[in-house]
Amino acid sequence: VGIGDLFSLRIAGNIAGQKVLGSLEFACQAKGSKVILVLGHTDCGAVTSACQLRLQQKQISDVKEMPHIQYVLGPLMHSVESVYDIMQPRELNKTFVNQVTAMNVHYNIQYIINNSTVLKDLLDRGEIAIVGAIYDVKTGHVEFLDA
């Protein structure tokens, strides 16, 4: 992997799962990628939908028109609940959704570290870095998050 080369993974809701872990392990262990960037973005439809469900006191199973949406929204609910517990007012607005987006980036970094011994070992040895950021879809600005 050279300068400017990317091994890109995209998934609705920016959710790390088993397939994402496998792809990240391949990118780092087999292909030599040195940085994992967990990049959330503003105006994320999946994050907004998860927030909306919680604020309306609905369950994912209430979304009948998309029977597989549980695999996208389910992992987001941890971040939604974390923000819901600490934030006032609890309403569907830009501030609430942005806080959930940032929390979700942090949560997924921890998920990667806690669920992949390969990536954790590479991280502990200083062979890779895992960083989080939020991409603003309106301005193109990327804000890197504190660890």
Question: Model-found features: residue ranges?
Answer:
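Divalent-metal-activated hydrolytic enzyme cores
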Residues: 4, 13-34, 45-147
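Short helix-loop-beta junction
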Residues: 1-8
